[in-house]
């Protein structure tokens, strides 16, 4: 990455104005350096093209031109990088500066095997190009590749059992279904063990659609039935492996997964025994009616979350407030777990599953 080519790309893009102003003074050059230094630092310190893309992602909201320079460098550095040329095309299209150039980089992404068709289909950056033959051809190819990439990944499960000695051997255990937030996945690791040690099988499920990498998923609408079907399929797969108590299936979610967990409990109370909703979020409307009665529900959010998330937390408190037992907790953080989650979450799960908590 620390190549002359990468520096040349960045310099050509960011210092183009200097070529037109050859008489700039040293003071002018000093004034330009703050705009250039984040790109130079990234090019010097990034280990590979993938890290350049991550750094560009972090810059995109604050400085599109700096991000564009890094995406270009990553695209040139690694001929197998898919997202880099895609993001170059998207940023050029967003700026409306050169449709031909934007389509050229979109084609380059296609030639490298672009597969995230659903993301391309809804990407507003390309709204003015959807009529073009190039865009339509790239989209068709990406949608076809997506079906291959998604097979076996969308809805895949991850299982974490309680530690030895936590529950009686041979018991058909309750299940806590974990619904992840936007852009991550249902994979469980050792850091999640405290949740399983509350006395249930922890079942993580990948979302119903991949986004732009094989470990990045979301729960798609309209509505929540697709998520319900994915959860039921995950439970069926789990039941084929081990004995579980299907009458004691609980939901736990974060952010977008939390909204879907709350909606599933409201709409399918015969299938779910309770829910723990952490920092609900998402773009769909929260259900306004609930069939759930006699359930234990926890709603947890940070006081520093955005207004939409705060409203959604209150919406769920009201939604389950009649005929159910609702506990509420706020913490000092933002859209994240509270700092004490490793102890407070297992305690909350035990209460949700019928304990004293």
Annotate each predicted stretch with a short phrase:
Residues 303-309:
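Acidic catalytic loop of the alpha/beta-hydrolase fold
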Residues 174-243:
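Serine-hydrolase catalytic machinery in alpha/beta-hydrolase-like enzymes
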Residues 247-293:
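Primarily recognizes the serine-hydrolase "nucleophile elbow" in alpha/beta-hydrolase
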Residues 130, 310-317, 321-357:
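C-terminal catalytic histidine-bearing segment of alpha/beta-hydrolase fold enzymes
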Residues 26-61, 65, 111-173:
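A domain-start/cap signature at the N-terminus of enzymes
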Residues 299-301:
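Short beta-strand/loop motif that positions the catalytic acidic residue
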């Amino acid at each position: 990455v620390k190549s002359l080519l990468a520096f040349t790309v960045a310099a050509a893009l960011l210092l183009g104005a200097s070529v037109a102003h050859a008489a700039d003074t040293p003071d002018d050059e000093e004034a330009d350096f703050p705009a250039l230094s984040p790109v130079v630092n990234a090019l010097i310190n990034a280990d590979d093209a993938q890290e350049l893309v991550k750094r560009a992602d972090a810059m995109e909201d604050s400085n599109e031109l700096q991000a564009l320079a890094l995406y270009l460098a990553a695209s040139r550095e690694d001929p197998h990088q898919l997202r880099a040329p895609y993001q170059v095309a998207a940023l050029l299209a967003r700026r409306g500066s050169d449709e031909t150039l934007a389509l050229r980089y979109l084609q380059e992404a296609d030639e490298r095997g672009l597969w995230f068709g659903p993301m391309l289909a809804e990407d507003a950056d390309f709204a003015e190009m959807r009529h073009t033959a190039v865009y339509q051809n790239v989209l068709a190819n990406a949608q076809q590749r997506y079906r291959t990439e998604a097979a076996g990944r969308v809805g895949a499960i991850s299982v974490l059992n309680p530690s030895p000695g936590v529950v009686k051997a041979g018991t058909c255990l309750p299940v806590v279904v974990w619904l992840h937030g936007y852009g991550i996945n249902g994979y469980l690791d050792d850091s999640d063990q405290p949740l399983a040690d509350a006395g249930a099988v922890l079942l993580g499920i990948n979302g119903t659609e991949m986004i732009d990498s094989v470990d990045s998923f979301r729960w798609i609408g309209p509505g929540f039935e697709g998520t319900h079907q994915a959860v039921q399929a995950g439970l069926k797969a789990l039941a084929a492996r081990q004995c579980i108590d299907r009458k004691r299936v609980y939901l736990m979610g974060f952010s977008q997964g939390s909204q879907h967990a709350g909606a599933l409990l409201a709409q399918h109370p015969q299938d779910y025994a309770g829910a723990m909703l952490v920092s609900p979020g998402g773009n769909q409307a929260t259900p306004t009616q609930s069939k759930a009665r006699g359930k234990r529900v926890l709603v947890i959010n940070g006081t520093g979350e955005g207004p939409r998330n705060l409203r959604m937390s209150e919406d769920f408190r009201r939604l389950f407030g009649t005929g159910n037992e609702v506990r509420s907790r706020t913490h000092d953080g933002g859209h994240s777990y509270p700092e004490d989650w490793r102890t407070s979450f297992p305690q909350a799960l035990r209460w949700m599953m019928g304990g004293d908590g």
